[in-house]
Every structure is written in structure tokens, then in C-alpha cells.
């Protein structure tokens, strides 16, 4: 079957202070590739529609083009065309194309009670990095700031991991975390007709350090930040080793954070407190 995806980046809402045009264009591609990763589909081609403000110069357009091409090639796709027009704000609309075996697609609707809930990384860095970019009152070391801000400016889609998980046949449901970990857990639960008990919230160590210094809740940063582009999957417990090996074979890590339950609620257990 043909697999199509479109998503739009608007500068006013999606491009924080400090993000270059090159990074903005690349991010627009990553946003779309992440959804392909969650389905286990290799993107092949990219169409781009650009809304360009009058104040952009020729060199700016060149930076956008380079960023789009870099993002596409990073994930094995090609920019094959598109359109441009004048707009009041920078708008980058991406249309991503690929093909897949319909039976092999990883959907959001297949989780079963007892399945292992897992993610491909730790959360909160984008939320913390965004706070650093938007508010100089937040404190951190130079090294930690670089890590957190890089999560915002150079996000990464987990395409290799998604393709490997699809090949493993171990995944029962899958989504990406671009809208925030909390939202995608509720979405998976709703689509699959299950609940989740999350007893291993995957908060990044860097986020815990940032939160301690700035007296903010690291759990909030991990749950509600968004734009992290990790995969959130449920795995048949009898095939856990296959799923784990598949991701590790791509240089990644599959982190168990809980399990699917019959109760249609998402419950967070932090140090025994629910």
C-alpha cells in the first residue's frame, strides 16, 4: 500500500528563538519522518510547499533548501519537488511518500493486556531545552545547556529503530511521542481499548539535574514537553528479546516503562505513589 503523511511547520509556533533556517527546514522533515518510523515504513520521497515572507533573502532560501535536503537524505529520502508562495510567516509544509506491506504496518490499535510498554529513549530534554531558549532565568552548566538545547534544535526521528521493530514482528501497537508522552499514552490506550500502568517513567538524567537546580518537576518535563520523536510501543512479552535485540542492533535502546492493563486508565506509579 502507499503510505502518505503531511505535516506543517509554522515559524511563529514551531520555531523557537535560536533555531536557524537550516534547522527549521530539517525539523519540518523530521516531524514527518517520525510518523513513518512509528509505522515501520521507509520514506522514499518528499514534496515541499513553502510559504515565504517578503523579508527573506536569496541566501535564506538557500539555507532552507539545504536543510530540507539534509533532513531528507539523513533518512534515506529525496526531495523531488514542490511549490513556493508568499506568506506572512515562514511556513514549511511537507508531504512524505513511501510504500509498505499493509499487513506489516505497526498501528496504534493492537495493544493487549499484559503487553510490555516501552520507549526508545528518555524524556524531558526538549521541554527543558525550550525553557532555556525562551527564558534566561533558568540556570544550568554550559555542557548541560548544550545537550538540552540540542534536543530542541536538532531533533532525531527513530526511523532505524522503527524499521527494525517492524521487522521483528514483536510490536503490537506503536506511535511517536511528538505530541508528548502523556498524550500518546492516552492515544494508544484509547485506540487499543486498554489501559497502562507506567511504573518506570523514563526521565532523562540531564532533565533531573536541570529540574533540581531550577526547582521544577522533572516528571512534568518528561510527560508534557512534546516534540521528542521517540517511539512508544507495546511488545508481546513472549517476543521481548526479539524487540530489544532489533533496536540494539541499530545502536539504540528499548526501555520498558510499564505494561498494558485491562483497566482502561493510564496510571502513573512514581515511587509507589499513584
Residue ranges, per PLM feature:
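Helix-biased detector of long, well-ordered alpha-helical tracts
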Residues: 1-274
Amino acid at each position: 500500500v502507499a503510505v502518505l503523511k503531511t505535516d506543517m511547520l509554522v515559524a511563529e509556533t514551531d520555531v523557537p528563538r535560536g533555531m536557524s533556517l537550516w534547522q527549521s527546514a530539517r525539523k519540518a522533515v523530521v516531524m514527518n519522518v517520525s510518523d513513518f518510523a512509528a509505522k515501520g515504513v521507509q520514506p522514499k520521497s518528499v514534496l515541499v510547499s513553502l510559504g515565504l515572507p517578503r523579508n527573506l533573502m536569496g541566501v535564506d532560501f538557500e539555507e532552507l533548501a539545504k536543510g530540507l535536503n539534509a533532513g531528507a537524505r539523513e533518512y534515506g529520502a529525496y526531495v523531488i519537488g514542490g511549490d513556493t508562495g508568499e506568506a506572512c510567516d515562514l511556513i514549511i509544509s511537507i508531504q512524505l511518500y513511501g510504500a509498505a506491506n499493509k499487513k506489516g504496518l505497526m498501528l496504534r490499535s493492537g495493544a493487549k493486556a499484559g503487553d510490555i510498554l516501552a520507549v526508545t529513549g528518555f524524556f524531558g530534554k526538549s521541554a527543558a531545552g525550550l525553557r532555556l531558549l525562551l527564558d534566561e532565568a533558568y540556570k544550568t552548566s554550559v555542557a548541560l545547556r548544550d545537550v538540552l538545547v540540542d534536543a530542541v534544535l536538532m531533533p532525531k526521528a527513530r526511523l532505524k529503530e522503527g524499521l527494525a521493530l517492524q521487522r521483528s514482528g514483536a510490536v503490537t501497537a506503536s506511535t511517536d511521542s511528538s505530541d508528548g508522552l502523556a498524550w500518546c499514552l492516552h492515544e494508544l490506550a484509547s485506540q487499543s481499548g486498554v489501559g497502562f500502568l507506567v511504573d518506570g517513567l523514563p526521565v532523562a538524567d540531564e532533565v533531573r539535574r536541570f529540574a533540581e537546580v531550577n526547582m521544577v518537576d522533572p516528571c512534568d518535563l518528561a510527560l508534557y514537553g512534546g516534540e521528542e520523536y521517540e517511539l512508544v510501543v507495546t511488545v508481546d512479552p513472549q517476543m521481548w528479546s526479539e524487540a530489544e535485540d532489533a533496536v540494539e542492533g541499530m545502536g539504540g535502546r528499548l526501555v520498558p516503562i510499564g505494561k498494558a492493563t485491562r483497566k482502561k486508565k493510564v496510571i502513573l506509579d512514581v515511587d509507589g505513589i499513584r
